[in-house]
UniProtKB/Swiss-Prot annotation:
One of its GO terms (biological process) is cellular detoxification of fluoride. One of its GO terms (molecular function) is metal ion binding. Na(+) is not transported, but it plays an essential structural role and its presence is essential for fluoride channel function. The keyword NAD does not apply. Na(+) binds at G76, T79. This is Fluoride-specific ion channel FluC. It comes from Methylocella silvestris (strain DSM 15510 / CIP 108128 / LMG 27833 / NCIMB 13906 / BL2). One of its GO terms (cellular component) is plasma membrane. The gene is fluC. The chain crosses the membrane at residues 4-24, 30-50, 68-88, 104-124.
Length: 131
C-alpha cells in the first residue's frame, strides 16, 4: 500500500511542478529557470517542515504512509534535481556562465536555507504549549 501512496504523491507533485514551472516561465520570459528554483526551494522547505513536524519528536503524529506520501511522493515528484542540472548545462552550452553559476548558487544556497527554515518553523511549532 505504501507504493500506492508514493505513486499518488509523485503524480500530484509532478503535475504541480509542471504547472508552476510553466506559469513562472510565462511570467518571467523564461530567460532564467526561476520556476525550477522556486520548485526546489519550496519543496526543500516542505520536506524540512513536514519531516520535523511529524518526526519522532514532532508535534503531530501521522502514519508512515502519510510521511511517505508527502516526503517521498509529493516532494519527490515536485522537486527536480535533473531539471536543475539540465537547465544549468544548457546555460553553460549557450555561453551563459554567469547565469549558470547564478543558478547553481541560488539553488544550493536557497534550498539549504529553505530546508533549515522549514525545520526551524516545525521545531518552534513542536515546542508550543497546548494545542
Amino acid at each position: 500500500m505504501d507504493y500506492l501512496w508514493i505513486m499518488i504523491g509523485s503524480a500530484l507533485g509532478g503535475a504541480a511542478r509542471f504547472w508552476v514551472t510553466g506559469f513562472v516561465a510565462e511570467q518571467t520570459g523564461g530567460i532564467f529557470p526561476w520556476g525550477t528554483v522556486l520548485i526546489n526551494v519550496s519543496g526543500s522547505f516542505l520536506i524540512g517542515f513536514f519531516g520535523s513536524l511529524t518526526g519522532a519528536e514532532g508535534r503531530f503524529v501521522v502514519g508512515e504512509s502519510a510521511r511517505l506520501f508527502v516526503m517521498i511522493g509529493l516532494c519527490g515528484g515536485f522537486t527536480t534535481f535533473s531539471s536543475f542540472s539540465l537547465q544549468t548545462l544548457n546555460l553553460m552550452r549557450q555561453g551563459e556562465m554567469i547565469r549558470a553559476g547564478g543558478n547553481i548558487a541560488l539553488s544550493v544556497v536557497f534550498c539549504l536555507l529553505a530546508v533549515w527554515l522549514g525545520h526551524v518553523v516545525a521545531v518552534a511549532i513542536n515546542q508550543m504549549k497546548g494545542a
